[in-house]
């Protein structure tokens, strides 16, 4: 099945402020939908602020919304999300808000109304039931309890 043949997931949204922008992709096939600021905010070095997007969405059941940083803002200006990734559960109906932080040590950054400040991706979220066991079976990769750099850096 080609990307153009895949069914489109419909995500209801509500505009809460006139300056709010509908989440959109820069290029067809992109996974992330840009979230834009619905207000202007100045972030001093080291400062964080919660930025309003002016929209609310209804993430479909069986899915989750993940809010991720925009790489260009991070690389060029040191702007990132405080809680990356942010999680939007299917039951949440409030305004999408993006907690940004200015990691730059010397430059103030101005978030302007309409500026793309984060990306939203929608992912399937499995229904799970956790089952207590005495012993966990080894995975196919035999990793065991190795974590935090156990695969090396090279």
Predicted regions and their residues:
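DUTPase catalytic domain/fold
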Residues: 1-154
